[in-house]
UniProtKB/Swiss-Prot annotation:
This is Exodeoxyribonuclease 7 large subunit. GO terms for biological process: DNA catabolic process. It comes from the Bacteria. It catalyses: Exonucleolytic cleavage in either 5'- to 3'- or 3'- to 5'-direction to yield nucleoside 5'-phosphates. The gene is xseA. It is found in: Cytoplasm. The keyword Methyltransferase does not apply. InterPro entries: Exonuc_VII_L (IPR003753), Exonuc_VII_lsu_C (IPR020579), OB-fold_nuc-bd_dom (IPR025824). Heterooligomer composed of large and small subunits. One of its GO terms (cellular component) is exodeoxyribonuclease VII complex. It holds the Pfam family Exonuc_VII_L. It comes from Photobacterium profundum (strain SS9). Bidirectionally degrades single-stranded DNA into large acid-insoluble oligonucleotides, which are then degraded further into small acid-soluble oligonucleotides. Belongs to the XseA family.
Amino acid sequence: MTLFTQTQSNDRIFTVSSLNAEVRLLLENEMGIVWLVGELSNLSMPVSGHWYFTLKDSRAQVKCAMFRGNNRRVTFKPANGTQVLVKARLSLYEPRGDYQLIIESMQPEGDGRLQQQFEQLKMSLAAEGLFAQALKKPLPEQPKRIGIITSKTGAALHDILTVLHRRDPSLPVVIYPTMVQGDGSAISIAQAIGRANARQECDVLIVGRGGGSLEDLWAFNEEIVARTIAASQIPIVSAVGHEVDVTIADFVADMRAPTPSAAAELVSRDITHQTQKIQQKNQQLKNAIRTYLSKREAKTVQLTHRLERQHPQLRLNQQQQHLDDISSRLERAMGRLLSSHHQHVERINYKLSLHSPVQTIKNNQTTLDQRKRRLLDAMDHRLLNANHKLALAAEKLETVSPLATLSRGYSITRDAKGKVIRHIDQVKPGDKLVTKVTDGEIHSTVSE
């Protein structure tokens, strides 16, 4: 009898925790081990050493946990976007009721459609001899001009230009912008290589882009790009992605660089024997470190296996996962607490600013400005009253003015000497007279 086939007469009432516990046991005991392929996403590697991620395909996804006792045996560095093949047990994370997979082993998934196409084209071109060492053209020791074929907005172009400028700022560079990802990108790359060969303005070309998934780099695995590189009269350095990324373009090119920056190093003029010795020592050191780490890792795996055989590891893993969950919530709570303290400090600073000398000066300045405005208003009022009184006095003066008399229709007559004529006996025929009226003067001569 399973959880879902109990009779009505014997119905069982569960708590949430007891239901989750029984579902977990049902999944782990009934399903057993499963194998599946998918793409890694949301990869998290906390300090506990466990890995948490999502495994997905085009239509669905499932949460996964891989505890450190198992992930130490993984021989490659997983990353988001990596296609993997995993061996897993179905389980349930009881505190949240999340259905999940407990991963026991993981390896790269190399049998996918793109990988198969890659291998088929690689074998076909190799059979034609396009990878033959005899076809490789040597790089110029003293290049006069370097051509770069990549995206004009990508990080790879910035990295290449930075290295070239640091090693030889006077070295001319020609950029042939192209698409490096998506539909039509392979044709765009091939056309850029053809354009560089037609112009013959460079004596070495760097063809590449920054890192990405297999799909992102696929343009450099297209046959048209491979054949265009092989037909190039100008030596080509392939610089696609990171050191672990390998494309068909790498096999056909005259030289392969692990990164765009490394390609700039290869074609730069100042590569010296001392630099080569340093690189050799660096590689020897890397190999020694890898050997040491490999031995330590093997020893650690051996001790881990021994510990797993002696302790109830599964229960410990469950508790550790729960601890990771609590730690995450604690970090969020601490963040909220720090935010609250920060706001409290801001409020205190604001209150202090209200009592600071600077604020007092600002307040006094405001009061001074207000009094200044009142004083100016009072002065304007006094001037207005004075102007009004002046206008009244002018009106009174106007009433006794000769001009006022003239404006009422009267006139004033003077002789040639300016003397006012009041009587008729003051003039005789022939005298010149000037009569003043309100809007001017009238000149006349006495006739009789």
